[in-house]
């Protein structure tokens, strides 16, 4: 994606056309070195918690919910990558317990200086024909990497949900992921429930550019070591910037007075989401997802008794 690229929030569609007709000149771009590392634990694997821990904006929440609903029919999980795939990832069974460690490394932030770009490059008067129904344009890009390590296990005769959840939390806490450290992880404080009883599995979510720079992990400890390498791997991607991990979308209504358009009526100038309403929809979606998993468990149990 590029600064100035047009976006239709109703369809989650990026248009190839640029707000200002051509690439934003360097003089109109401000680059900030904002290196920062943050760590989060997602305890219950709900959409609501994932959205909150990844700081997803309300409008984007609405778009993602719509895409997830449509994907039940038209797309598979393999169509998603990185933390987008993580958000979409849901278990088939209510008996599967998941806890995730989210590592976010910010490197640089690029943003359009609107006053400068307006003076240097006039907006494209025909943009509404090239990018119909656009609602936003990309005004800022955050670079870096988001890596997510998920541990999961299923409730069985030997371990109930509470004991498994406690064991997975302790396992993640014991891993002590510290990016940049060369020390091996000390597993002496791992929970005493055996991996055989727990049958702990892992899944790693990260942009494909980083997978190509290192061997893919085969177990939890290798996944942790991979996460520890992320700062050094970021330095090898896009001249140290990493990948695009988030965008700041500027609504067209915010800069309407600057636009030189032949027919501004073809563009959507008003926000599409109410934060409270979207929050309630996310909760309902989580409840429906949980009910679907419980129903699937009942169906599987019934088939197993036939």
Language model regions located:
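Membrane-permeabilization and membrane-interfacing ectodomains
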Residues: 1-305
């Amino acid at each position: 994606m590029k600064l100035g690229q047009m976006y239709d929030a109703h369809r989650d569609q990026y248009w190839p056309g640029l707000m200002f007709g051509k690439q934003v000149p360097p003089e109109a771009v401000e680059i900030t070195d904002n290196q920062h590392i943050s760590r989060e634990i997602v305890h219950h694997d709900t959409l609501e918690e994932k959205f909150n821990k990844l700081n997803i904006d309300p409008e984007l929440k609405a778009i993602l919910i719509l895409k997830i609903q449509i994907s039940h029919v038209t797309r598979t999980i393999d169509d998603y990558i990185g933390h987008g795939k993580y958000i979409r990832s849901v278990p088939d069974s209510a008996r599967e317990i998941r806890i995730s460690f989210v590592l976010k490394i910010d490197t640089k932030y690029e943003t359009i200086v609107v006053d400068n770009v307006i003076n240097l490059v006039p907006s494209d008067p025909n943009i509404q024909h090239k990018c119909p129904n656009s609602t936003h344009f990309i005004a800022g890009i955050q670079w870096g990497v988001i890596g997510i390590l998920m541990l999961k296990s299923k409730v069985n005769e030997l371990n109930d949900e509470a004991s498994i959840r406690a064991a997975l939390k302790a396992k993640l806490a014991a891993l002590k992921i510290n990016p940049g450290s060369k020390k091996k992880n000390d597993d002496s404080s791992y929970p005493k429930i055996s991996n055989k009883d727990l049958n702990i599995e892992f899944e790693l979510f990260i942009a494909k550019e980083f997978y190509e720079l290192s061997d893919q992990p085969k177990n939890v400890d290798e996944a942790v070591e991979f996460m520890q390498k992320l700062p050094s791997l970021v330095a090898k991607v896009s001249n140290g910037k990493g990948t695009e991990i988030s965008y700041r979308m500027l609504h067209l209504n915010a800069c309407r007075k600057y636009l030189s358009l032949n027919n501004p009526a073809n563009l959507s100038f008003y926000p599409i989401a109410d934060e409270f309403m979207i929050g309630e929809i996310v909760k309902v979606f989580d409840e429906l997802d949980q009910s679907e998993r419980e129903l699937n468990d009942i169906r599987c149990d019934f088939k197993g008794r036939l």
